């Protein structure tokens, strides 16, 4: 019989067994799921953006390097700023 280092509910954090507490293991699982998820490259729109290091994301197709969040290529705050900039640009283009 093969023993697995993860469980159905906790996923990859099952490797820690009963150590460190449930909340921490659940948070770790959520972070690891976000890290491993496939993201689209903002340059070529190909879904092969991978995490190379802390806040460094590299496209496997075009080789573009992007600075983003630690666990996702774009943070929540980054999305808010991008929307605000887009609104300002649109309002200026309407005035002209």
Swiss-Prot record:
<dbReference type="GO" id="GO:1990904">
    <property type="term" value="C:ribonucleoprotein complex"/>
</dbReference>
<dbReference type="GO" id="GO:0008270">
    <property type="term" value="F:zinc ion binding"/>
</dbReference>
<keyword id="KW-0862">Zinc</keyword>
<dbReference type="Pfam" id="PF01780">
    <property type="entry name" value="Ribosomal_L37ae"/>
</dbReference>
<dbReference type="GO" id="GO:0070180">
    <property type="term" value="F:large ribosomal subunit rRNA binding"/>
</dbReference>
<feature type="zinc finger region" description="C4-type">
    <location>
        <begin position="41"/>
        <end position="62"/>
    </location>
</feature>
<dbReference type="InterPro" id="IPR002674">
    <property type="entry name" value="Ribosomal_eL43"/>
</dbReference>
<dbReference type="InterPro" id="IPR011332">
    <property type="entry name" value="Ribosomal_zn-bd"/>
</dbReference>
<keyword id="KW-0479">Metal-binding</keyword>
<dbReference type="GO" id="GO:0005840">
    <property type="term" value="C:ribosome"/>
</dbReference>
<keyword id="KW-0687">Ribonucleoprotein</keyword>
<keyword id="KW-0694">RNA-binding</keyword>
<dbReference type="InterPro" id="IPR011331">
    <property type="entry name" value="Ribosomal_eL37/eL43"/>
</dbReference>
<dbReference type="GO" id="GO:0006412">
    <property type="term" value="P:translation"/>
</dbReference>
<protein>
    <recommendedName>
        <fullName>Large ribosomal subunit protein eL43</fullName>
    </recommendedName>
</protein>
<dbReference type="InterPro" id="IPR050522">
    <property type="entry name" value="Ribosomal_protein_eL43"/>
</dbReference>
<comment type="similarity">
    <text>Belongs to the eukaryotic ribosomal protein eL43 family.</text>
</comment>
<keyword id="KW-0863">Zinc-finger</keyword>
<keyword id="KW-0689">Ribosomal protein</keyword>
<dbReference type="GO" id="GO:0003735">
    <property type="term" value="F:structural constituent of ribosome"/>
</dbReference>
């Amino acid at each position: 019989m093969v023993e697995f280092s993860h469980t159905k509910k906790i996923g990859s954090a099952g490797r820690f067994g009963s150590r460190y507490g449930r909340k921490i293991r659940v948070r770790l699982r959520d972070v690891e799921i976000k890290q491993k998820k496939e993201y689209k490259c903002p340059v070529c729109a190909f879904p092969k953006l991978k995490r190379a290091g802390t806040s460094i994301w590299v496209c496997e197709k075009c080789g573009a390097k992007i600075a983003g969040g630690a666990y996702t290529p774009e943070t929540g705050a980054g999305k808010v700023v991008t929307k605000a900039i887009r609104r300002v640009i649109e309002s200026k283009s309407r005035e002209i």
